[in-house]
Amino acid sequence: RGNDVTLIEKHPDLGGRARVFKKNGFIYDGGPTVITAPHLINELFELFKKKPKDYLELTPLKIWYQFIFEDKTRFNYSGDEEDMKKQIEKINREDVLGYKKLVNFTKKIFDKGFTELADVPFDRPFVMMQQLPALLKLKSYKSVYSLVSSYIKNEKLRRMLSMHPLLVGGNPFTTT
């Protein structure tokens, strides 16, 4: 449209975290990768009678993300629930209890969606209909942001705790 645009990129190829690059004959996705089920990697290697440790090393991160808000407040997001509560308390003490409740509720969602239903084929409408009561109980009709907001009052914390759909190209305000 005739706009004069300058692209600034750290890497030799464009795309930032979403770039694709080639190295040693392989094509890599340079995007953010979160491995939430490392046991599945082990299962894949076992199918080929191989050991993952012979090919890769997974290193758990102490800090998963660091958020820096407009007011320069920093938050180190991690899997350490106690540390998360301490940081939440610094931003809004009232949200610590809401965070505990949110974590407990999302564990139920994970148990249903990943643990119980991950291997269930939804190849017939009846199979999906059987899950309708559980989907309603787990508030699957709410967006991620809306669900988080029902437990968390502080806007910074709401945005931070709603960001996960972004990792797979989703919108926290519309993704359920």
PLM segments and residue spans:
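Rossmann-like flavin
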Residues: 70-175
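N-terminal glycine-rich phosphate/pyrophosphate-binding loop and immediately adjacent elements
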Residues: 1-108
